């Protein structure tokens, strides 16, 4: 009997466990798209509309059937993307590292590959969040001139409060997360209205916690990641945009709540396969794989500020 790919795959349990616990503090996409696992690649995502906010008849007469209500609806199929790279450890490097206590070159190589895959996940999450076509006209604003938060005459707080009210009227909850492009974070730290607000505190700098207090949201995170294109051009992953959203709390992410987005990840991933020796290059190789897709499932729960920088 032939084996399928899942049965044939031999995992390195220690490195796989390490991979599943791997995090990179520089990446913030999970703040908008928390990870939920999928048992299979063939599944459809649950999307959210305004049906959960419609007034329903709940009163029941004796002997009458009980009304039923289903939240959300089965939406588009989730197309998981497989990201795969091999961590290569030349035996010469391994021999040299063996003379130094505490150095595990195999794990170092896996960490390097995991960082590359995590960057790809961050880029995909940012692309989904920054796609203006995914938002209703009421839930986005392309800023220009004195509206830009980098302009000293702008009023970011008023704009955020207006956006919070848009989201509240769409989903009945106030947003709890604000993601800022890295350059935008720096600009807000110098904005005259914000520095004047915190001047009595004698703070040396405007922190993210202070911005969260200023905008009255639970969490403000700064998307500082960059990457280089093939031509050498450096790209700011989150650009000069800001995304305000309501994201389901950690204990409620399996429930049909109108959360902004999720990263659907195949169960058992990421994984690291057992090392194999490649005689042609005299190196050990560990294949690292992950399968995921960042999905905007509740655009009503978000607001996109385009070109705020």
Where are these regions (language model features)?
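Hydrophobic, aromatic-lined core segments that form the binding pocket/scaffold
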Residues: 48, 62-69
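Generic alpha-helix detector with strongest preference for long hydrophobic helices that associate
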Residues: 68, 93-94, 103, 169, ...
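Residue-level detector of transmembrane insertion/anchoring sites
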Residues: 71-72, 171
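Short acidic, glycine/tyrosine-flanked loop/strand segments centered on an H-E-D-like triad
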Residues: 73-98
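General structural signal for secondary-structure boundaries
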Residues: 88-94, 181, 203, 207, ...
């Amino acid at each position: 009997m032939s084996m399928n790919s899942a049965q044939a795959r031999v995992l390195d349990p220690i490195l796989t466990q390490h991979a599943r616990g791997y995090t990179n503090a520089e990446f913030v996409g999970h703040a908008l798209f928390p990870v939920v696992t999928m048992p299979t690649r063939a599944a459809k995502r649950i999307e959210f509309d305004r049906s959960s906010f419609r007034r329903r008849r709940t009163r029941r007469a004796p002997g009458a059937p009980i009304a039923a209500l289903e939240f959300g609806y089965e939406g588009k199929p989730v197309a998981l993307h497989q990201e795969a790279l091999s961590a290569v450890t030349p035996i010469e490097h391994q021999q040299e590292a063996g003379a130094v206590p505490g150095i595990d070159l195999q794990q170092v190589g896996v960490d390097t590959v995991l960082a590359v895959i995590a960057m790809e996940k961050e880029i995909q999450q940012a692309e989904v969040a920054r796609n203006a076509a995914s938002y209703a006209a009421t839930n986005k604003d392309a800023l220009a001139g004195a509206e830009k938060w980098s302009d000293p005459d702008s009023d970011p707080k008023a704009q955020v409060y207006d956006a919070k009210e848009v989201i509240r009227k769409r989903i009945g909850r106030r947003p709890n997360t604000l993601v800022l492009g890295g350059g935008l974070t720096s600009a807000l730290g110098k904005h005259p209205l914000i520095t004047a607000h915190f001047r009595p505190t004698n703070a040396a700098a405007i922190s993210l916690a202070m911005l969260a207090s200023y905008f009255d949201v639970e969490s403000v995170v700064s998307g500082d990641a960059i990457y280089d294109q093939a031509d050498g051009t450096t790209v700011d992953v989150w650009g000069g945009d800001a995304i305000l959203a309501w994201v389901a709390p950690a204990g409620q992410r399996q429930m049909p709540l109108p959360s902004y987005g999720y990263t659907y990840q195949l169960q058992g991933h990421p994984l690291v396969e057992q090392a194999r020796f490649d005689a042609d290059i005299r190196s050990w190789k560990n294949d690292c794989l992950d399968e995921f897709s960042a999905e905007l499932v509740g655009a009503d729960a978000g607001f996109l500020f385009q070109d705020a920088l």
